[in-house]
Amino acid sequence: MKQLFRDQLSNTQLVSRLFATAKKSGEHGNRAIYGQGLMDLGAATNPWGTPAFMGAGSSLGNSDGASMATSFISLGSALGDSLPQSLNTQEVAAFDDLGAPFWFEASDFTVPSDGASVATRLNRFLTPPQRPPIPTNWQFNFQEKAAATETGHLALTHGASRFTMAGPQGVAATVFQKSQDLEGLTLSWTPAVLPALTMEAGYLNEHQSLLNSQGSGAFGRLSGQTLFLSAGLDTSLGDWELEAQGEVGQVNPSVSHSQFIDTISPLATSTFRLAASRPFVNGSALRFSLSQPLRVHSGAASLSLPTGRTQEGAVVGTTLSAPLVPSGRQLDLSTQLDVPWLEGDLSLGATRSTQPRHQQSAAPEWTFFTGYRATW
């Protein structure tokens, strides 16, 4: 037992643990025969009660910990596999109800991103990004709980309500709101003298997540404010219509009530999309696109992880800087064919994703979609 607990429990504490975990029910409760009960090494060498994480530097018994069962961090797609990679081979200690330490792989409490859902990919397939024309009069539009089809920073607004105003001067503004979760604003301008160019600035305030990453228990509560700039350019080359769009952003993270995360540095983000389309005289259209979903390319978290205890009951730990840059870079190469059919349009599409979810070791993924759209 001294080896199991790495000599962090004194002989007296080990004996007390054996007494506390001994079987005392039924006939084993007869103190005249069994004294402290029937010794149970299995119970003595396994967590007693629900283990909890304590902050490094705290004292056992003098502070409340975070239950191990509810301590995890679920990563958004922009962070990919960054934290599991940073915590690879790193141990973290949790303490049971009797104060004994037990060690676990820290990366086991991170949940890497699953990437965009099938429903989100289908929405993007059915409604590919298109720049609206400059209106001749002021236009207003409201969408409740709108699906975000964007692959950039506005992908974070999925499920938020949108109110858009667009004017004949090429100026447009959109307000985003999702109760208790997010609010944001974008301002865009398309110069009348250069209608092929659009510039946009945006602000998003996430209250309960950081780039769609959510923490719980010892990882605390994450939030973040994002500022981003984007530019888009349209042009024609023969029968082809070409589009290019890029975004860069900076995220100012916040973390509270965490035993593990001390601070998170500002995060730099980016995304881009290149597209080409060719319409045909019969109404068909062929489209190609290459895009990178939103990705963090600089930033780190300062962590203080509990790694054990002293025999006097003080929690000891280690500090480290965990880079939040994913190991890979997802690139989506898509092709789509739209064909008129039965008073509507039949769409066939395929996407090949390399290093999906920004994970360098992940095998390429293929996605195929078929859709039909008609209006009456």
Residue ranges of predicted features:
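Hydrolase catalytic cores
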Residues: M1-A32
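Secreted peptidase-domain scaffold signal
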Residues: A44-I134
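Outer membrane beta-barrel translocator domains of Type V secretion systems
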Residues: E105-V248, Q360
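A subset of solvent-exposed loop/turn segments in beta-rich extracellular surface proteins, enriched
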Residues: T136-H153, T157, S258, G299-A314, ...
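Outer-membrane beta-barrel "beta-signal"
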Residues: T335, V339, A363-W376
